[in-house]
Structures are given as structure tokens and as C-alpha cells.
Amino acid sequence: MAINRVYTRDFWTDVSSVNRIVWVKPVVIPYIDTDDELAAILSHSIAHGVDSYEGILRGYISILNYWVAPNKYDLKADKTAVDYMVNADYNPLALITILNKIGKQYRYDVFSNHTLVSRRMMLIYEYIYTKYPNVLVDNDYKDNIYYQNFLLTSRKNRMKLLEKIQTNSKNKIRYSY
């Protein structure tokens, strides 16, 4: 699939699910410090576009799924974005750092249908840890303040992941925030 162009757009949501156009919010651009972080944003948006394009009427109907249950599709797009980044030789940890910079944490929002950013970052970390462990060994982000913040605030969750791996458990981990 070819992407026609990348635009910036002032709009309340990212729309990359129809017409093969990737939109990037202008408010995000000042937070991008590296090519890896730009690749993270684009990979996530492209993953949404690719996922929705395979639907009825070329994806026009599947956009309703995103509005009804965005949580499921964001988590799938996060994993696909990691795969895209690794295949394109970008550091997938940038997805964690950019989410740490721009992600809003709706901790007490009972009506939110989005996964908490802290949980999303941990699920991305778990996916990288299990599928691409060599990325974590000696990475360029080890001194990055946003990655360090993630490591500091996710210590208990990373211990849960370590316990799951050591016990060979197949159970899903309920990460705290």
C-alpha cells in the first residue's frame, strides 16, 4: 500500500483511516525531537490506516469501529507500529518516549474508552521485550529523560512482566497506572 501524502491538520482527532492520507496534528510537531519519534507517530497513524482500509467500502464503514471502541484499535496499532519501526530500522522505544511526551493520562475518567497512556506504554514495552529483546539491551534511549521517566514510573509493572516471564505464565497482566 502506498501512502499518498502526509498532512498536518487542526482537527480534534487524527484521521488516517480513509483515502490513504496520514494526518499529523500540528500541536504534536514541537514534541518530536528525533527521526525515531517522527517514525513512531507516522507508524502508528499508518497502522490505523492499513487496518481500516481492509473494510467495507474501502474502510469508510470501519471508521465507526474506531469511534465506538478506539481502545482495541489503538493497542493493535501500537504493536503494528513497533513492527513497522523495527522493519524500517527505527528504534521502537521512541513510541514510548513520544507517548510519554504527548499522551494524556485520563486516570479517573470513568467514561473514557481509551487505555491509560501508562498502560499503553507498558504494553508496548512488553511487546518489544518479548518480540524484539535486543532493542532493550543497548539502546539509544537509555539516557533519554522521557524513557527514564517511563522506567522509573513503570517499575512495579515491569516486575509483573518479569514474574510472568519467569513463571512462563500465559495470563494477561493487569498493569496499574
What annotation goes with each model-predicted range?
Residues 28-37, 45-61, 88-90:
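Catalytic Zn2+-binding segment of zinc metalloproteases
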Residues 1-4, 30, 75, 79-177:
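C-terminal capping/extension segments of zinc metalloprotease domains
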Residues 1-20:
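Catalytic zinc-binding patch centered on the HExxH motif and its immediate surroundings
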Residues 4-7, 26-27, 43-45, 98-99:
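Active-site-proximal beta-strand/loop segments in catalytic clefts of secreted hydrolases
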Residues 20-26:
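Short, aliphatic-rich beta-strand segments
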Residues 42-51, 76, 80:
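Active-site His/Glu-centered metal-binding helix of metallohydrolases
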Residues 18-20, 36-39:
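Envelope-exposed proteins and targeting segments
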Residues 52-72, 101-105:
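Substrate-binding clefts and substrate-entry loops adjacent to catalytic sites
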